[in-house]
Amino acid sequence: MKIWFLSLAAVLLSSCSSDAPVAKAPVKPPEAETGRQGFYKTFPQAHTWAVDAQPMRVRSIEMKELQADGGKAAAWEVSYASEAKGRSRVYTWSAVEAEGVHQGVFASQEEAWRPGGADKPFPIQALKIDTPEALQTAIEHSVTYFKNLGSKPHPKFVLEYTARYPNPSWRVYWGESVSTAEWSVFVDSATGAYQGR
């Protein structure tokens, strides 16, 4: 009798202890990021690749899968250089999966690089001004451009050293590329000062 009772109790207890389904947290929709946020998404992997990795260029990537505004972009491409390795490497961060760009952070193949060339790295500390502030400064100094009626392309961003200015600059431009831009403005990435067109 005791064995039968214990068997019945064991069966009843085991049937009561089934795991209830756990509610999953809702998936957060992808969000565009600022230039500085995009840079800091790629930096840990670049630093793992080369301890002395320094950025040479930060570039926004516009994507139809996720529209962005206010100085943000759906994806960012950051070029790094390592003087110790004599190599450069491009990392991308993307909020979404799209043709040619993977979601998350991905690295390209290493390429040869030497100091003193056209692509000059800059210290991370020079990235004090983020893209929303650079965009605001660019708009304030683009009254002539915005007086012209008609639709304007979405603004894009490139941060790099140029021969024109002593500090790295955010180039805020309206157009498909830097070379075909309708309008572009340079903003100092360390001070936020307007530098010119």
Identify the residue ranges that each predicted region occupies:
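Sec-dependent bacterial lipoprotein signal peptides
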Residues: M1-S14
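Long, terminal "pre-/pro-" and other extracytoplasmic accessory regions
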Residues: C16-R197
